[in-house]
Amino acid sequence: MPDAFTIRPAAPNDAQEVARIRVLGWRFAYQGLVPQGYLDSLNVAEDTERMHGYLSQLPQNLPPNNIASVQGPNDGEKRSFMLAVRDDAVLGFCHFSAAPNNADRPGRATPGGEMVGRLHSLYIDPDALGQGIGHALMSHALSTFTAWGCERVHLWVLEGNSRAVSFYE
C-alpha cells in the first residue's frame, strides 16, 4: 500500500508541479475527446507562469488544515486551491470556489444570495490514480463548501468523459 498523503493549501512555489499535473491530467483524461494536436501543445512552462500568478493571489503561510480561502473579485466570493502531497511530491490538486448566486444571472455573484459552490478542477497525477487521492480532495472540497454555507455545488464534465462522470456520481 502506498504511503499516506496530506492535503494542504497550494502556494506560488507549487506552480510548476500544479502545471505538470494539469498537463498530464489533460493528456490522460481527454485523450480521444480533445484533438490530439491540442493536447500535445500543452506546455508546462507556460502553464507554470499562469499558475504562479493565480496561486500568488491566495493567502500564504496558513496552517495545513486551513481551507485557504481568499475573497474573490466579486462580493462574497471565496476561492480555495488544495494539494495532495506525499513526501513533498504533489500528487493532485483541487481548485474550487463559492459565491452568492444571482438568480437572474446564474454564475454572477450577488451579495446576500444563496451560496453556490463550483468545482473548477480536480486532477491527479495519472501515476497516482487509484490511491484515494481524488476522493480525499473531493471530500475536503465538500466539507469546505459546507463550511462556506453552500447548499448546492456545480461542476462541468466534458461530454464523453465517462471516468469523471463515474467519479462524481
Stretches with model-predicted labels:
Residues 155-165:
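Conserved beta-strand-loop-alpha-helix junction that forms the acyl-donor binding cleft
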Residues 125-127, 131, 159-160:
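Active-site acidic-Proline motif in GNAT/NAT acetyltransferases
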Residues 151:
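Short acidic/polar active-site loop segments enriched in Thr and Asp
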Residues 168-169:
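Conserved active-site tyrosine of GNAT-family acetyltransferases
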Residues 5, 9-12, 19-127, 135-140, ...:
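Acetyl-CoA-dependent GNAT
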Residues 1-2:
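Basic/polar N-terminal segments that are highly enriched at the extreme N-terminus
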Residues 12-15, 161-162:
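Alpha-helix N-cap/helix-start and coil->helix boundary motif
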